[in-house]
């Protein structure tokens, strides 16, 4: 959850509350100041009666200190995150295809995620020493040097929005439909703290022009800003899009935002999108990527509330194909899938595969499709029982070929095309 948790495939969720020690009265067995059953032998036989009477209070004070220390530890956040098994649920419940929603689904394709949680001191000890089904990362390794927790969550939702578009494009293209897209701007993906952008822009907004000159892509933005020196005041046309309360990307109106360019911390040479390298001396302080507007011949809507990250791409692609294919893709099997996808149907590696394997087993999957590369296949095999058959794939075509061998059926152009609205 992209796909880095609120579930993530992504997004962070509150750390689980660790079990608390019992109150002092329970630990002693009695609360009347006398010796608890089974503790009398702990009192030295030669001790005075005063010593014997005070012993429960000494233990009570010790337990109180332990409880207090546990409470403090449970409320101190530390710069570590944990990835734990999340859920695995039928992907068809997230997908709407009005032209095909009357088809009965045979079997299930499961979308799986993980939970990404920031740790407190007590939870860190629990996951480090008492639970082997997790991965712990430092905030530096997971977020990077300058990404805040809230920005990390927003980036996960942006990855999911892109994954939905790519999954739809890959699915429809495989089924024989014609799919096109248009570059419409430079999406603000990250913001450098203390930069000019930090005062003016927000993650998920889209820059469409600089001083009135259109910037329809990341490359266009780089080229436009390259013309100006540090200290120059420019006006950015910014679509004020955002992430809503359920993690969905929402477009907004365009506003004009004045920004004074700063001197780049270090002059950097940029390979200008296939053109000659250019040296940047001024910067606005953002990480950007090209925002695309997709034209689909079939109306497909994907609702993945509060799930972030890119790794649901393969599952969503298969789910869309299954919807349009009459629900016959799995051959009646319960099939789980994870993997990042591009618009061409290529599948690349994701995180949390070991934890996802645990989640899909718990959900009853018998087949698990994972990316073949970067250790994903090995991670899944290391956690899978003999009842879960793991297959590594690099493309949607390979995934479909495996499902066909297992009894699934795929056709092309299964429903008449109708422009999405």
Region annotations inferred by a language model:
Residues 170-203, 409-421:
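PDZ/PDZ-like groove recognition
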Residues 197-220, 239, 357, 361-370:
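Conserved PDZ fold ligand-binding element
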Residues 223-280, 382-405, 412-420:
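PDZ-domain C-terminal substructure recognizer with occasional recognition of PDZ-binding tails
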Residues 1-55, 136-137, 146:
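Terminal targeting segments of Actinobacterial cell-envelope proteins
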Residues 82-105, 109-116, 139-192, 265-337:
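PDZ/PDZ-like peptide-tail recognition elements
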Residues 310, 318, 323-326, 331, ...:
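Glycine- and Gly-Pro-enriched alpha-helical subdomains that act as flexible
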Residues 57-76:
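Hydrophobic membrane-insertion alpha-helices, especially the h-region
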Residues 371-383:
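Short, glycine/polar-rich helix-capping loops at beta-to-alpha or helix-loop-helix junctions
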């Amino acid at each position: 959850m992209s796909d880095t948790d609120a579930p993530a495939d992504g997004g962070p969720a509150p750390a689980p509350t660790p079990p608390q020690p019992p109150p002092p009265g329970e630990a002693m067995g009695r609360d009347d100041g006398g010796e608890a059953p089974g503790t009398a032998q702990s009192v030295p036989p030669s001790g005075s009666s005063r010593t014997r009477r005070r012993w429960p209070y000494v233990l009570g004070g010790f337990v109180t200190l332990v409880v207090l220390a546990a409470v403090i530890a449970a409320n101190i956040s530390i710069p570590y995150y944990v990835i734990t098994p999340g859920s695995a649920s039928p992907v068809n419940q997230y997908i709407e295809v009005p032209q095909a929603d009357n088809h009965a689904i045979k079997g299930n394709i499961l979308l799986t995620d993980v939970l990404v949680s920031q740790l407190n001191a007590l939870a860190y000890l629990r996951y480090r020493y008492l639970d082997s089904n997790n991965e712990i990362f430092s905030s530096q390794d997971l977020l990077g040097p300058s990404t805040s927790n809230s920005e990390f969550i927003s980036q996960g939702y942006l990855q999911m929005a892109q994954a939905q578009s790519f999954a739809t494009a890959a699915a429809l293209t495989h089924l024989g439909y014609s799919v096109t897209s248009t570059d419409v701007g430079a999406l603000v993906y990250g913001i450098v703290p203390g930069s000019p952008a930090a005062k003016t822009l927000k993650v998920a907004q889209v820059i469409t022009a600089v001083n009135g000159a259109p910037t329809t892509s990341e490359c266009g933005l780089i080229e436009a800003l390259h013309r100006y020196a540090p200290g120059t005041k420019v006006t950015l046309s910014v679509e004020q899009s955002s992430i809503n309360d359920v993690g969905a990307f929402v477009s907004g109106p365009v506003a004009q935002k004045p920004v004074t360019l700063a001197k780049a911390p270090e002059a950097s040479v940029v390979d200008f999108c296939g053109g000659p390298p250019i040296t940047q001396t001024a910067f606005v302080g953002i990480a950007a990527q090209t925002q695309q507007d997709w034209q689909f011949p079939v109306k497909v809507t994907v609702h993945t509330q509060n799930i972030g990250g890119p790794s649901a791409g393969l599952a969503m692609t298969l789910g869309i194909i299954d919807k349009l294919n009459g629900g016959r893709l799995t051959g009646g099997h319960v099939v789980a899938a994870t993997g990042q996808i591009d618009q061409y149907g290529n599948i690349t590696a994701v995180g949390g595969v070991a934890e996802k394997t645990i989640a899909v087993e718990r959900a009853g999957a018998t087949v698990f499709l994972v990316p073949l590369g970067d250790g994903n296949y090995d991670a899944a095999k290391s956690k899978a029982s003999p009842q879960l058959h793991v297959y590594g794939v690099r493309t949607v075509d390979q995934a479909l070929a495996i499902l066909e061998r297992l009894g699934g059926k795929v056709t092309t152009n299964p429903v008449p095309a109708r422009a999405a609205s």
